């Protein structure tokens, strides 16, 4: 089950460029059956390999990569400002929290796809109703190639009328929201299919 509750309820900087150490990158090894709830297995990629895959990204996407794994202030206002800056590029916004078990299972899928498609698609996180220390610990264990906006009061969650986390919002290159997926992605193929259907140029 994913975490749900009523709608009315209310830096760790691991930048990609210049990191010499190997960072743990959890890759989703999915079960054969669609919708499997099994947690993904883990492996590692070096920072150099991540940088190689993301090298040459357009400036707005490269700016995201430079803020990899950071938790930024701003909540909904910060997210809206970033989406405006990303106009011209499709975007995927993942709403997560450290206290959310399904988010922990889904994050490796987000991480892998954000590396595979990070030169064409923008990825942004929203850390909802979380404890900062818990959130940074979460990201230390499952580092991602993009920043998350801290949203302690659940502004984005409430504005989107979501019913649980994780949830993922899709935007086309014009900045129009095209789809909302409520619930986790446990399989890479499912996330990629939705990106191609709802967000990709």
Give the residues covered by each predicted segment.
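Thiol/disulfide oxidoreductase modules built on the thioredoxin-like
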Residues: 11, 137-145, 150-201
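Short pre-active-site segment immediately N-terminal to redox-active cysteine/selenocysteine motifs
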Residues: 89-91, 96-99, 164
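N-terminal targeting signals for export/organelle localization
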Residues: 1-73, 201
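Conserved redox-active cysteine motifs that mediate thiol-disulfide chemistry
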Residues: 95-112
